[in-house]
């Protein structure tokens, strides 16, 4: 067994492992950028577990974040797309990779590790615990109050990009539990189809992103309005 970073020539094995592990949750952009990431990592580095024949048994995306812990910005090592070869499930490949990842970050002096668990009990056995809660609100549109004045709202322009990023990172610097990632932050915000900003006297005071999600009512007239991110200061 060999544990090392995945090579660009092994991208097909890596893509197959990720898709068979997350068949409905693998973003198309992740697959499109995968080979480029193996040449020049931006989002993170893919660590792989190989057998003696060079078959990829499992993989994990190692990502470097900065996390606000009660006002102190700390480095954090994150695990994403923990994937096992479909023909090698239940062989503790994922467990082995996570242990290697945790030892790596411990040697780097990184005090915090995180991941988004498919099964919290599975990762609890490795020392992971719960962090801040993630709330999902589902109000009816009729329950959203209108204050009449929307003059400060506008769709974000390309020239607003850096100002919005600076606004988010200032928010992250004062908010416990917020994270910063040089690659993920702009993609999380600007890969959304709609970004709206709020200005007061010309100064940015907030922004949110949104999209329309189809609801299966056998007609294209029904949609949910999804707002994954809303950051504001007033």
Ranges and model annotations:
Residues 1-3:
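Extreme N-terminal starter segment of soluble prokaryotic enzymes
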Residues 22-68, 173-195:
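Active-site rim helix/loop that mediates acceptor-substrate recognition in acyltransferases
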